[in-house]
Amino acid sequence: MKKDIPVKKNSTYNLYITGMGTKGEGIGKINNFTIFVTGAILGEEVEVNIIKVNKNYAVGKLLNIITPSANRVEPPCDIYTKCGGCQLQHMSYKEQLNFKRQKVKDALLRLGGIDVEVEEVLGMENPYRYRNKVQLPIGKEKGKVNIGFYAPRSHNIIDLKSCFIQDEKADKIIKILKEWIEKFNVSIYDEKEHKGNLRHIMVRTAFRTGQIMIVLVTKDKKLPHKEELINKLTEDLEGVVSIIQNMNSQKTNVVLGKESIVLWGKDKIIDYIGNFKFAITPLSFFQVNPIQTEVLYNKALEYADLKGDEVVFDAYCGTGTISLFLSQKAKKVYGVEIVNEAIESAKLNARENNVDNVDFIVGESEQIIPELIEKGIKADVVVVDPPRKGCEKSLLEAMAKMAPEKIVYVSCDPATLARDLGVLEELGYKTMKVQPVDMFSNTYHVETIILMTYYGDKKK
């Protein structure tokens, strides 16, 4: 029997928002039929125009807020509704944290069958200006230079004068770059035609040391009038220690190419997380919110509860940041990462910080763990910080065979976290603590750190 759909495209309806979607959309129902509304908040009555209808849900465009929520605030950014960078600026920060906590709780219960207390989200004192890295496409439309983020679900560049989640000095750098492009009529890359030269700008700021790296991404090696830009950037701004040109001649959405040349200054900047020093190059992975990264890693250390004689296994060690934190309290840490360049950076970071109780290994953790077991090496604690897609099931099974007393799972996606925890619970682990951390304020993203303890059969 065909399901009757109670709404029609291009029609207008009043709607009560009774829930929130995973990307911060308001959710309401008409005759039990679900409607998603970007920009609406739980508890509001809104007027919407239906712009998309599927058999199980519809999407409504917010036309009018009939009854606003007490948690609604005026977004500070004047391009907030056009830009794809933030999704929650219209919510009070307290409500953003409530939303993120509920998002984690819902995912664990609905997708993992795990009913557990979720702690209040560890938020920021100031939820703005927290990003230490920004990379922006550069384009031209009707003769006007645009530097900014892409509009949602498009490659249309929304020009920005100021971004409230990136470091303020990046705003000044972008302004100088735009003036230079206009003054010298600098060739700008057209991604449709694969013509032109200047593609992206990336700015990396070391919050602790104040050092700034500016990366100009071009299609060609030639960069006319670069001396004028270098002079302006270095004269007008404090902290600039590195200006780099990165060449990317490929027809691709990948921002950085493989070849870089130093135009001025150094080839890296230095920053700290806790007491550890890290060298950052254009291609280095480094957490974009160093303030909350320290909060997150200290929580990982707390959950691991190391006494000094434990062996720890870090299954997605990247450039070694969590491994180094764990090394402070562990007897030995083994860090594994499939990307060779990341392992080389991890080894360098260990040397630079005089850490000698960490071994970094290139490979897949699901293959390395059995090799370590064969050598008689067993972990007391396993830490995983996987990409958004979560862990391979074979890794979870290998971890369970190693049977560590504790697993500390750091996740950037509640859905894949819930799936993986469900698997681990079947393999003999119990979820004990769930702590969300707000790493990406004003966006729908949330980081979560989990403590699991072993209760299964040690002989398996």
Swiss-Prot record:
Domain TRAM positions: 6-64
GO molecular function: 4 iron, 4 sulfur cluster binding; metal ion binding; rRNA (uridine-C5-)-methyltransferase activity
UniProt keyword annotation of Methyltransferase present: yes
GO biological process, one term: rRNA base methylation
Entry keywords, A to Z: 4Fe-4S, Iron, Iron-sulfur, Metal-binding, Methyltransferase, S-adenosyl-L-methionine, Transferase
Annotated residues for binding of [4Fe-4S] cluster: C77, C83, C86, C163
Residue positions binding S-adenosyl-L-methionine: Q287, Y316, E337, D385
EC nos: 2.1.1.-
Xref: SUPFAM superfamilies: Nucleic acid-binding proteins, S-adenosyl-L-methionine-dependent methyltransferases
Metal-binding recorded as keyword: yes
Enzyme class per UniProt: transferase
Gene3D superfamilies from the UniProt entry: 2.40.50.1070, Nucleic acid-binding proteins, Vaccinia Virus protein VP39
Active site: C412
Entry similarity comment: Belongs to the class I-like SAM-binding methyltransferase superfamily. RNA M5U methyltransferase family.
Official protein name in the record: Uncharacterized RNA methyltransferase CTC_02481
Taxonomic lineage: Bacteria, Bacillati, Bacillota, Clostridia, Eubacteriales
